[in-house]
Regions:
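A short helix-loop-beta-strand connector motif used in the catalytic cores of GNAT acetyltransferases and
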Residues: 1-12
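Acyl-donor (CoA/ACP) binding surface of acyl/acetyltransferases
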Residues: 10, 15-116
Length: 116
C-alpha cells in the first residue's frame, strides 16, 4: 500500500505590480516514489497569454525540486487545452502519456530534477 502526504503547498503568482493573479500548488506528495503533482491557476483573465503561467511553473518546479527531496513533478491537463500544454512545455515540462478520468482525456506531463 502506498501512502501519500496530502498536505499541499501553495505559492502566490503576482504580476509586475505585485497584484496576485493566481496560485501554483504542489500536492499528492509521495515521498516513497519521490514525486508530487503540481498545478496552476491564473484566475485573472487579463493576465492570460502574457507568460505568467509558464514563468510561474518553471520557477515553482525549479524551487520545489531543489528544496524538497523529490525526483519529479507531474501534472495532468485536458487534451483539448493546447494553450496550457504549450505553456507547460515552455516551462520545461515534457509529455509522457495520457489517461482517462470521468470521461475526459488528460495529457500527462513531467519535470524531472535531473533536467535542472
Amino acid at each position: 500500500m502506498r501512502y501519500t502526504d496530502m498536505a499541499a503547498r501553495y505559492f502566490a503568482v503576482e504580476d509586475e505590480g505585485g497584484h496576485r493573479i493566481g496560485n501554483v500548488m504542489y500536492y499528492n506528495l509521495d515521498r516513497s516514489r519521490g514525486e508530487a503533482e503540481i498545478g496552476i491557476s491564473i484566475g485573472a483573465r487579463d493576465a492570460w497569454g502574457k507568460g505568467y503561467g509558464s514563468d510561474a511553473m518553471r520557477t515553482a518546479a525549479r524551487y520545489v525540486l531543489s528544496t524538497v527531496d523529490l525526483k519529479r513533478l507531474y501534472l495532468r491537463t485536458l487534451d483539448w487545452n493546447e494553450r496550457a500544454q504549450r505553456a507547460f512545455q515552455k516551462a520545461g515540462f515534457v509529455a509522457y502519456g495520457s489517461s482517462f478520468r470521468e470521461g475526459h482525456k488528460f495529457i500527462l506531463m513531467e519535470f524531472r530534477r535531473e533536467w535542472l
